[in-house]
Amino acid sequence: MEEIRAWRHVFKLDPNKPIDDERLERLCESGTDAVIVGGTDGVTLDGVLDLLARIRRFSVPCALEVTDIEALTPGFDAYLIPMVLNSCRVDWVIGRHHEAVKQYGDVMNWDEIFAEGYCILNGECKAAKLTEANTALDDDDVVAYARLAEHLYKLPIFYLEYSGTYGNPSLVEKVKRALSRTQLVYGGGIMTPEQAAEMARYADTVVVGNAVYDSFESALATVEAVKRIDGENEISGVK
C-alpha cells in the first residue's frame, strides 16, 4: 500500500480501446507513477492479457482495476477493487466482491488487493448507469461518503469519479480536508495540464484516462504538470 500511496499521477488504459506501440511506450516512459488497466464495458480476458504483456516491457508499475471477474489474471503489481458506495444495487457494494472471494478466496494474495470506495458523480457516464449510482448528491453527501470510507469501512482509497466530465475542484478540496488516512483519488475529464495541476493541489492521486485516446500530447503533458505542483509544494513546505 505504501507504493500506491506514493502515486501522484496515474494513466488509466481501457483494454477495450486501441493504443499503438509507439504511444504506449511514450506513456509508460513518461514519468507517470503507474498505469491502471480497467474499463466499464467490453473488458475481456484477451484484451487485458494483451495490454498487460505490452505494458510489462516497461518498468512502470501496473495495476488491474477489477470490474469483471472473467477478466481477472495474475501478473499485475496490484488489484484495485471498486466498491461503488453510492450505488443503489448491493451487487456493486459487496455482492460481486462476495462472489469473487467465494470462488477465489483460497488463492488470493491479499497483500496485492486494495478496495476503492468509489463515489460516481457524473450521472450520464456508463459507470453510473451500469451501477445505478445515485448521483443527485450535494457536497455534504459526498463528504459523508468519504468519511464512511475512512472511518466506518476503513478503506485505503476513496475515488471521486466524474468519468468523462471535469469535476468541481472546491468539492475535491472539501473531501480532502475530511480525510486523514484514506487516499483521495480523483478521476474524470482531465484533458489539459492545467486541469491536472488544479486537481493535484487537492487530490492525493490524479487519474488521466480519456485524454490518452482523445488528446494524447496533452495527456502526456499532465505528468509534468503534476510534478510542478509537487515541486511548488516542496518549496512552500506544503505536504
Curated annotation (Swiss-Prot):
Enzyme Commission code: 2.5.1.n9
InterPro entries per record: GGGP/HepGP_synthase_I, GGGP/HepGP_synthase_sf, GGGP_HepGP_synthase
Domain of life per record: Bacteria
Gene3D superfamilies to which the protein is assigned, alphabetical: FMN-linked oxidoreductases
Cited function: Prenyltransferase that catalyzes in vivo the transfer of the heptaprenyl moiety of heptaprenyl pyrophosphate (HepPP; 35 carbon atoms) to the C3 hydroxyl of sn-glycerol-1-phosphate (G1P), producing heptaprenylglyceryl phosphate (HepGP). This reaction is an ether-bond-formation step in the biosynthesis of archaea-type G1P-based membrane lipids found in Bacillales.
Database matches in PANTHER family: HEPTAPRENYLGLYCERYL PHOSPHATE SYNTHASE (PTHR40029:SF2), PTHR40029
Name of the protein in question: Heptaprenylglyceryl phosphate synthase
